[in-house]
Amino acid sequence: MSAFIVLGAQWGDEGKGKMTDYLAEEANVVVRFQGGNNAGHTVVVGDKEYKLRLIPSGILYEDKLNVIGNGVVVDPKALFEEIEYLEGVGVKISPEKLIVSDRAQLIMPYHKVLDKLKEKARGKNDIGTTGRGIGPCYTDKFERCGIRVCDLLHEDVFIEKLRENVEMKNAYITKVLGGEALNFDEILDEYLGFAKKLRPFVQDTSVKVYDAIKADKTVLFEGAQGMLLDIDYGTYPYVTSSNTTAGGVSSGSGIGPNMITNAVGITKAYTTRVGKGPFPTELLGETGDWIREKGHEYGVNTGRSRRCGWLDLVIIKTAVRVSGLTSLAVTKIDTLAGLEKIKVCVGYKFNDTVIDYFPASLEDLAECEPIYEEFDGWDDSVADVRSYDELPENVKKYLARISEFTGTRISIVGVGPKRDQTMRIDNL
């Protein structure tokens, strides 16, 4: 029995899609357990580039079962657009390769309208939402008025729930936020059309995943976003609306925590984040710009430029603790090639004291000054390296310090965006 998790250990965009694709070769089942189509990732196989948002990365293999779990919020329109895109580039999609939980919450048109209007109303205090309705959908889930996939497949139930929601949301949209009312009949027609297309893919995915584990098949749980975007442990309120840490796996997939054997944390060799919020190691000058351009640090979904900075080991150590990471995968070693000196943060100066933890308060975090250790860089291009022994000595020293500080083995190193630019150096 083997069930392991792939999680982001930073603010997202660490290369989880690539690592999931790489590790999916060892898996029989790949499961998304949280988030929605707000988290895009790119997978490069040979000369082909695939951009995924909602569908698990295992879809690029012919023989893997891909699962959208109950913890995911599903926009049917986005799902079928992604299916159409994948089929257009030669990836076959069928209910034998992809299943969707009957317990997953549906993103509705009013969720997207609310997302954008509320963000506009926040003014300078906006939180940088993607506007895809993720937060409002999770809000409805916890207010117990959300519409689930199973509701969509029962037309009478769906009509009743949709009518109640549209009435309530229209009142709020028009009277409080100053927006235009949505048309009930238009939404109904559109979603009844989705119901017919979605029905063949719908199952009790918890049972399917449980049975796979019990049958000694290998299951990979694919996280979206990263630890610092977790609703509880992230830089709140500049976070997503779900649990991106290992704690979200059981509730988002219906599998007990005792069935999970390993958790791999993905980290870049440096740090990036999108949007607002404190960023202790951010590089605002030429070095930050150089990393951004060389690393192509722009969002898959939004195209927004990412803020770049030195690797913050306090963050990685926090991710190890919160998610019980058993190993780390370090990506984008190749991006740093060419820098004379490279720094890593090993603590913060705060109120005339030294701390080695990540503060909950954003105000406190904003006052933290990073304490750096400096390493010699590497001029060698590492993009063609395929074994640990061939890596430059300075890269090995850099990786050794990451492992030493976090108390965690490094199992995988990435030296480029392609599937074959990945080397396994230890067990997960």
From Swiss-Prot:
It is found in: Cytoplasm. PROSITE patterns: ADENYLOSUCCIN_SYN_1, ADENYLOSUCCIN_SYN_2. Its cofactor is Mg(2+). Pathway: Purine metabolism; AMP biosynthesis via de novo pathway; AMP from IMP: step 1/2. IMP binds at residues 13-16, 38-41, 130, 144, 225, 240, 304. The active site is at residues 13, 41. GO terms for biological process: 'de novo' AMP biosynthetic process; IMP metabolic process. Binds 1 Mg(2+) ion per subunit. It is an enzyme of class 6 (ligase). Homodimer. Plays an important role in the de novo pathway of purine nucleotide biosynthesis. Catalyzes the first committed step in the biosynthesis of AMP from IMP. This is Adenylosuccinate synthetase. It comes from Clostridium beijerinckii (strain ATCC 51743 / NCIMB 8052). The lineage of its organism: Bacteria, Bacillati, Bacillota, Clostridia, Eubacteriales. The gene is purA.
